[in-house]
Amino acid sequence: MEPSFQLPWNGIHHIALLTADLDATVRFYRDVLGMHTSDIAPSREGRGRHCLIFAKRDDDNVWGFHFFERPIEKTTLGAADAYPQSFVPHVALRLPDGEAARVLRERLSGARVSVTDIPELGSFVFFDNNGLCLEVTWPKGVRGS
């Protein structure tokens, strides 16, 4: 169904999420996933400390994640406990090829992060340190896939 009018959307800029441990979240995304991070900004006006996790470095059109530290209970945001086959809700991340996916899978294994294959999509999912379900996709048929 077509909207009554259209705007020239360029995609999703960032997703804001909560974490109970910002330092652990930065370590996971930087050291395990190899993403770039901003400096941790101090808490002001009740916002809590916060940090940007860049999915694509040096691209102001796409940041990635904006994590805010709050005293929350750690939960499984991906609902895998209640619905083990669904992995919904989740965030899907895109890699350039299958070789990059293989390298990430090895890094996750080295960090003792369990990976579940989604054979019908040719992707895999895992949970970050906050219990957020992340899916990794890449173009099929590209060298290294």
Where is each model-derived feature located?
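Acetyl-CoA-dependent GNAT
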Residues: 68-73, 139-140
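Vicinal oxygen chelate
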Residues: 1-8, 11-20, 51-57, 77-145, ...
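Short consensus segments that form the blades of beta-propeller domains
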Residues: 6, 42-43, 81-82
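Conserved beta-strand in the GNAT
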Residues: 64-68, 135
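Core segments of cupin and vicinal oxygen chelate
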Residues: 18-63
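Alpha-helix termination/capping residues and helix-transition junctions
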Residues: 6-9, 32, 85
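A short, acidic/glycine-rich surface segment
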Residues: 1, 72-79, 144
